[in-house]
From Swiss-Prot:
<keyword id="KW-0472">Membrane</keyword>
<feature type="site" description="Part of the hydrophobic cavity (in subunit A) that receives Val-60 from the adjacent subunit (B); essential in hemolysis, since it is critical for pore formation in cholesterol-rich membrane cells (such as red blood cells)">
    <location>
        <position position="16"/>
    </location>
</feature>
<dbReference type="GO" id="GO:0090729">
    <property type="term" value="F:toxin activity"/>
</dbReference>
<comment type="similarity">
    <text>Belongs to the actinoporin family. Sea anemone subfamily.</text>
</comment>
<keyword id="KW-0446">Lipid-binding</keyword>
<keyword id="KW-1052">Target cell membrane</keyword>
<comment type="subunit">
    <text>Octamer or nonamer in membranes. Monomer in the soluble state.</text>
</comment>
<dbReference type="GO" id="GO:0008289">
    <property type="term" value="F:lipid binding"/>
</dbReference>
<dbReference type="GO" id="GO:0016020">
    <property type="term" value="C:membrane"/>
</dbReference>
<dbReference type="GO" id="GO:0031640">
    <property type="term" value="P:killing of cells of another organism"/>
</dbReference>
<keyword id="KW-0800">Toxin</keyword>
<keyword id="KW-0406">Ion transport</keyword>
<keyword id="KW-0204">Cytolysis</keyword>
<keyword id="KW-0964">Secreted</keyword>
<keyword id="KW-0812">Transmembrane</keyword>
<keyword id="KW-1053">Target membrane</keyword>
<dbReference type="GO" id="GO:0005576">
    <property type="term" value="C:extracellular region"/>
</dbReference>
Length: 20
């Protein structure tokens, strides 16, 4: 669903920020 996709995207952004 759109909600799940949004959560996945937000999680990816957070992970990307942590890895930088």
């Amino acid at each position: 669903s759109a909600e799940v996709a949004g959560a996945v995207i937000e999680g990816a952004k957070l992970t990307f920020n942590v890895l930088q």
